[in-house]
Amino acid sequence: SAIMGPNMADQATGVFWGAFTLFACTTASIMSGAVIERIRMASFVILAVILGSVVWNLAASWGWHPAGWLVTEYGYHDAVASGVVHTISGFFALGVLINLGPRIGKFNADGSANVIRGHSLPMTITGLMLIVVGFFGFIGACVLYNYGVNGGWTNIYGGPTTLSAYCFNTLMAIAGGIIGCYACTRDPFWMMSGALCGVISAAAGLDLWYPPLAFAIAFAGGY
């Protein structure tokens, strides 16, 4: 294929391949948080292949491409895959959990729920920092150079944007999510999840939001 050969005019194909492979793996990673230690490895691999190779690809073709029908018909805008990665993965995991049921020990015989807390705050913070670093790579892959009719730096749809907008709004979203979750729970473990909620809540429009708006959206998501 000519696509595999050297082509100095093609600035996007290799980026798309790497980014879409990363995002397919990310869908399985998101699902793993719901089923880890609860299903067999073979079962997880099967679910990961279905989610990353079929379900997510359909969502990406519909809403994460300039010619996708959600984009052309309804103006759907999801610059950093808030919907086509995280929402799709979340609902897929929900479908698995409906059949799997609650974790052992989550509920008592009378129906009351037990709080299953994290076992190590330092490990949780370390994990959050690694995820934040990964988010910058994830988000940076959504900014393309010389792609589409506008040229220069563009989003996944070919619209003009800047890498600065993505980076700064990502920082604002992380801060907003952490603060919003702390305001609601006063729990350091939940604050770590609040950072993720903040980024995911604001991710769809990181190329559009005014920074305080990105913070406000993330605060609401974390809260």
PLM feature spans:
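Hydrophobic alpha-helical transmembrane bundles of multi-pass membrane proteins
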Residues: 1-223
